[in-house]
């Protein structure tokens, strides 16, 4: 681990703590050269999870892409970032617990819609309109009717 202050490659771990859910490890480090301290966070690596797109192309799972999709749907809505970050984490955990090496993008889209439906119905409709490729007002009305009937 390189020191962010002096770029020396020799550091030592001073303190290690796990998060409440044991998904992230926080480490306090000290540089041997300049003696400054800094914090690092280690998280489970999702690079072993591959997303299969509609066109059958494959790419590594990207949690930021999930977050950005939800964030875009919630623009100008009263939804705190902390809620979206928690939902992103829950989607990650659900995908991890499925023990699949590959997951269809449609499965991720459905998980996002499920979370957004609970968080904010307007954001849900926004996401659904893009994800399900609504082409007319009728599609919007049908989805809104489904929400009203729940």
From Swiss-Prot:
One of its GO terms (biological process) is negative regulation of DNA-templated transcription. Residues 49-139 form the ATP-cone domain. The keyword Zinc-finger applies. One of its GO terms (molecular function) is DNA binding. It holds the Pfam family Zn_ribbon_NrdR. Keywords: ATP-binding, DNA-binding, Metal-binding, Nucleotide-binding, Repressor, Transcription, Transcription regulation, Zinc, Zinc-finger. NCBIfam families: transcriptional regulator NrdR. Belongs to the NrdR family. This is Transcriptional repressor NrdR. It comes from Finegoldia magna (strain ATCC 29328 / DSM 20472 / WAL 2508) (Peptostreptococcus magnus).
């Amino acid at each position: 681990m390189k020191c962010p202050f002096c770029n020396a490659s020799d550091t030592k771990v001073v303190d290690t703590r796990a998060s409440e859910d044991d998904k992230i490890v926080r480490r306090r480090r000290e540089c041997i050269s300049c003696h400054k301290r800094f914090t690092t966070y280690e998280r489970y690596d999702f690079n072993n999870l591959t997303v299969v797109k509609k066109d059958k192309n494959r790419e590594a799972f990207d949690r930021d892409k999930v977050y950005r999709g939800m964030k875009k749907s919630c623009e100008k809505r009263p939804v705190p970032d902390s809620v979206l970050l928690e939902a992103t984490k829950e989607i990650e955990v659900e995908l991890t617990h499925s023990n699949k090496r590959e997951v269809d993008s449609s499965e991720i889209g459905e998980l996002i819609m499920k979370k957004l439906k609970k968080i904010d119905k307007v954001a849900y409709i926004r996401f659904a309109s893009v994800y399900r490729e609504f082409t007319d007002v009728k599609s919007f009305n049908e989805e809104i009717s489904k929400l009203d009937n729940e």
